[in-house]
Amino acid sequence: MRYERLAPEAIPGALRDLDGWSLSEQGDAITKEFSFDDFAQAFGFMTECAIIAEKMGHHPEWFNVYRRVDVRLTTHDVGGLTGHDLKLAAAMDQVAKRRV
């Protein structure tokens, strides 16, 4: 599947529709830190998101320490952000809301 890179002027509006996501310093990715009650909640979040990401064919860069999960989303094939990143970010937000 081929994805179109988002125009730089479209990114601020797209971020307004997401909860707590930020544009990376390089401007080629969005990032968010998720925080949970404990490691089991954090790992459960990652497990559920991994299944969604696999079905989408789009995989996050992420890092987990205890109850925190740091996520970075970008589309490597186009060297920047696409609608696919926004879709996965929204799905991850929904998973996190169910785990609070």
From Swiss-Prot:
InterPro entries: PCD_sf (IPR036428), Pterin_deHydtase (IPR001533). Its EC number is 4.2.1.96. Transmembrane segments: none annotated. CDD domains: PCD_DCoH_subfamily_b (cd00914). Disulfide bonds: none annotated. The keyword Nucleotide-binding does not apply. GO terms for molecular function: 4-alpha-hydroxytetrahydrobiopterin dehydratase activity. It is an enzyme of class 4 (lyase). The keyword Cell membrane does not apply. It holds the Pfam family Pterin_4a. It catalyses: (4aS,6R)-4a-hydroxy-L-erythro-5,6,7,8-tetrahydrobiopterin = (6R)-L-erythro-6,7-dihydrobiopterin + H2O. It comes from the Bacteria. GO terms for biological process: tetrahydrobiopterin biosynthetic process. Keywords: Lyase. NCBIfam families: PRK00823.1-2 (NF002017), PRK00823.1-3 (NF002018). Belongs to the pterin-4-alpha-carbinolamine dehydratase family. This is Putative pterin-4-alpha-carbinolamine dehydratase. It comes from Allorhizobium ampelinum (strain ATCC BAA-846 / DSM 112012 / S4) (Agrobacterium vitis (strain S4)). The lineage of its organism: Bacteria, Pseudomonadati, Pseudomonadota, Alphaproteobacteria, Hyphomicrobiales.
